[in-house]
């Protein structure tokens, strides 16, 4: 993975672009996730997606921390040790909440990614109701943001695949008799 020099962004802060060895954006796939955020579209500027790929995410956090320590003079204006850099870094997954916040629109306010249903047909993002559906998301790491006393990763939502949520409306367990007949005694 390579990182660029810090550049001023439109918000007045600084951003570092992140590229992999082939000079392509790093793409990260999330496992199936559910959100309680409501409707995707104009009413919501971002969604929260849960991930079960915590090992891969923690590895990416370590790579980012390594780069931050190595480039601390350029990124922060002075050389810093790993402990100091780690205190400033906002990890991808918060310990309290295993979620990643991903904006769904770009600067123009429109979503340019693809939204697909279970049949792989393109659908309108305004028709997605997160309270009744599950989805897979493909997100892309697009840079590192810096604000006073903190830095973290910036993400872009590339695609969403919507799945109907399966609700259990009837008894879902096997018969108790079947379960106990195969069990071994303690």
Question: Where does each model-flagged region fall?
Answer:
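Basic, polyanion-binding surface patches
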Residues: 147, 160-186
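OB-fold ssDNA-binding interfaces and closely related basic DNA-contact patches used
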Residues: 1-106
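Short coil/turn segments at secondary-structure boundaries
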Residues: 31, 150-153, 169-172
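Short non-domain terminal segments
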Residues: 26, 114, 169-171
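Low-complexity, compositionally biased segments
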Residues: 64, 84, 108, 177-185
